[in-house]
Amino acid sequence: MIMSKSTSAPIGIRSLGVSFPQVIRTNDYWQQKYPEMVRSSPQRNRSNRAVRSSHEDNGYDLWSQEVAPYLSDPFRGNVERRVLGLDESSLDLQCQAATEALLAAKLDVEEIDVAIVASLFADNLGMDNTTLLAQKLGLNCPAWNLESTCSSALVALQNARALIQTEEYQNALVIVAHFGSNTVREKDTLAWSMGDGAGALIVDRLKPNQGVLANKIVSTAATYGAYHHQLELDEVGKPRIVTQTGENASSLAETAVDFVRTCCQEAAVKAGVSLAEIDFWVFNTPTPWYANVCTRALDIEPERTINLYSHYGNIGAVFPLANLYHAAKEKKIAENSLVLVYTNGASATAAATIMRWGDVALGTAPAPSISDRPTTIELQEIKPRDDTEQKLSLPKILAAPPEQQQQVLASYLITWLANSLQLLPHEIEPELPLIMWLDSLMAFSLKSRIETDLEISIPIKNFLGENNLTDLTQLILDRITLSNLAIVPSVNSHEISERETDRETMSL
């Protein structure tokens, strides 16, 4: 049931500016500097299978179907990323984005009532640079930091709107930045995805019926541990934060569909509109396939959204602003378009904001992509999972004759891989390194599945590197054997204790 439409004051985005580093780093950088990182991938001739509706898929199935086409690419769909050059600073980039938004709105810094800043991984370690930013811009108004990982932009917009709604302030400058390239080791494949950028917007009163209509924000605490951050010294002895894939990375895949459906559907109810009425959708895209997952989860047409991942890589909290900017620049949205923006911030919040787009002024366009990739997403053909997928449990393995246990276990693993990669079982070659089949998220998903089904713990390192399916099968079998042996003494001790008690009773 659709509720009545929002009657709140028309407050939303008045102007929008973005800023990106001058350096556009392509895959050639790693191919030339670290050729050993770039592996040739096995040939994967996909079988033709019948298409089925996305409504029959659970969240992980849908995710794995969209990941699968990228696994044959050594760079997993990464094409370009903008990274800070030696003569650039994170502060400069933020100032440029803010200046673009101010100029587009034809406002002076003295006219800004409040500034809200969300800066992820800026130059100054351990502290945000809001004060330095306000000082460099010449702001005299209150300014503070707000952070909710990749949902920071929408959370900041929600806060700015609320402050203006209560008439505490007349307008707000929101500045959002992400400098992921600073936090990853170049020889870590996670570096292939990390980009840098900044965006800014002026939040103000708009024409009647325009602006933000509703928000829905939920906790993503279930994804805590998806990324691991640690402090280390760089090559010149300067401390820095290093980001790596965490032990709970599989939760990103397992929860993605539920979060996007919950936020978008409930935001629509609050706004008094249906999802079918949305003219254009904007998703944050931390992976090449993320927009596809969201589009399929909500059953919307691909031409009603945009995917800039191939242009920017993962720019975190900046994505909603960059996507809105490019969508407006490319005339995909216009004044009075009904727009839904969705973001998912790991270990923080997922958020959906529905707005009636106003006459938004845009700052100077960033340098164009050099890869000439389309921004309209292309959905992969949905292929059904094998209905004969093997269900395995610890008792089932132990019930099999010892000489057949390894074969039973290998069949279980091959079936999981075949279904996840949309291959036929005979296409899975057990002697190839697992890294040829799995990206990091799928490796954690397989780890989680094994530990749930078989009640044993397997270190993540055994799913990566040069380990192959045969190695993994033998390791799991060894763990099961040890686990079973550990149970036997406790049972025997209990039986012995009962016998001793019987003897004592008889002797008495």
Model-found features: residue ranges?
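Conserved beta-ketoacyl condensing-enzyme motif
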Residues: 66, 70, 82-148, 267-291
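Conserved small-residue
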Residues: 13-15, 101, 115, 156, ...
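Phosphopantetheine-dependent thiolation modules in NRPS/PKS and related acyl-activating systems
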Residues: 387-508
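A contiguous, well-structured pocket-lining segment that forms one wall/lid of small-molecule binding clefts
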Residues: 241-303, 307-309, 390-399
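Short beta-strand segments
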Residues: 14-17, 147, 172-178, 203, ...
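Condensing-enzyme catalytic core mediating Claisen C-C bond formation in acyl metabolism
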Residues: 2-88, 188-254, 262, 356-381
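Flexible, glycine-rich active-site loops centered on histidine and acidic residues
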Residues: 167-198
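Claisen-condensing/thiolase-fold acyl-transfer catalytic domains that form or cleave C-C bonds
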Residues: 5, 91, 95, 121-122, ...
